[in-house]
Amino acid sequence: MAFGLSDKITIDKSENYIMSIRLRSDGLSFSVYNPSEKESFLYKEVPFERGRNYISSLKEIFFENEFFSWHYKKVNVICASYPYTIIPKELFQEKYKTEILTFTTSAVEKHCLSNVLTNEHAELVFGIEDEVYEFCSRSLVNPYFVHHITPILPLLRKLSCNSLSKQLFVNLHRQSIDIIGYAQGSLIFINSFEYKQTEDIVYYVLYVWKQMGMSQQSDQLSLFGDPSACQDLNKILKDYIQYIKLLGMPSEAYLLGTDVLQTPLDVIALSLCEL
């Protein structure tokens, strides 16, 4: 499957642009933009054929679209919904990160990576399939691998710092959710769950809400991610939680261009770091 980029993005100008490739279980998406140029943001979804080997689909997309191998200012590889764990900075040891990830998740025989969570004084450790990691490392120029949780935490923390109440954030993906809790800028909960139907999400959210001792009268639930799923969940949860907010994108994101309207928040957050 071959597809083109904007006429503005050519191989001789590619070093002015930042590319982010978002890997997910059923395909990938990518964005390309120039941090110095307003409304230059381009975003595209690429679904993979069902039942086909993931690495075969990935290779086909890369080989049929040579712009993936161009020299960019920076290349990010976002690993979406991959297994992860968070380790306090004082307990983190590089040599043991694979053992810890295997012990705490189902990430067996995966290449182990980590991202620094500066504001949380912790490391996020995650796994990616060896074949996928090796192929991306060979095919892309100096790629930076980042878990999708990593770039959204600073945004959520900032929102929490401006609130006196506890806040529970729910990030809705196609087959999984991230639940993240903050209290005045301090991370108090983070975990991800797979789901098959909306009722599963309702159970996880209400269970975490109760376990965190959150107040129906003063604390807030914020939903973001898949728009239709957010609307459906809001209709159900408003019978249980008084303050529910559908989280929009940061106002500065609109400077990137109209494609941000269909872009996951983790990609946007990573892009805003470069502005």
Predicted regions and their residues:
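Hydrophobic/aromatic-enriched cytosolic interaction surfaces used to assemble or bind macromolecules
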Residues: M1-L275
